[in-house]
């Protein structure tokens, strides 16, 4: 599979091969660096990578199975660098079902991070709330959500 190509829903065992190949490409680009912490940057958090030092940037176009992002403001790259002396992998831009991606594509980066040895993952996103006390930029911890995709995220084989 070449960079940027879609991962077929019917790929089955092929998805594991895509994850392995993507991981190999990322490892090669990182050399000796092996971050253990990753953050998925949601809308409005792209600036985070600008605060990192000693960075290595890998555009999605160079990672097998990673499609281009279509959401404005989503960088479309992995950035590994240091924050407070800690090595961090930042995913700048992600893939969404509403862009036409299958669930196995939407979770491809997270599964690849696990294959890379990431031990801690922080997921961020833009979210709305019904409380009038919520203002733009309010940090929230989400305990549940309304799933309007009509897809169960728990279906499929467990690996």
Where are each of the predicted segments found?
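Metabolite-binding pocket within alpha/beta catalytic cores that recognizes anionic/polar moieties
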Residues: 2-159
């Amino acid at each position: 599979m070449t960079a940027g190509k879609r991962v077929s829903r019917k790929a089955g065992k092929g998805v594991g091969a895509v994850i392995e190949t993507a991981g190999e490409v990322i490892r090669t680009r990182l050399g000796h660096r092996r971050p253990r912490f990753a953050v998925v940057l949601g809308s409005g958090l792209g600036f985070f990578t600008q605060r990192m030092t000693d960075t290595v940037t890998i555009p999605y176009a160079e990672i097998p199975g990673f499609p281009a992002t279509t959401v404005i403001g989503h960088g479309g790259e992995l950035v590994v660098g240091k924050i407070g002396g800690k090595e961090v992998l930042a995913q700048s831009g992600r893939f969404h079902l509403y862009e036409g991606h299958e669930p196995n594509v939407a979770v491809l980066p997270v599964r690849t991070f696990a294959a890379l040895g990431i031990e801690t993952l922080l997921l961020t996103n833009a979210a709305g709330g019904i409380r009038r006390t919520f203002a733009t930029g309010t940090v929230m911890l989400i305990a549940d959500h309304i799933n309007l995709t009509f897809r169960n995220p728990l279906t499929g084989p467990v690996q």
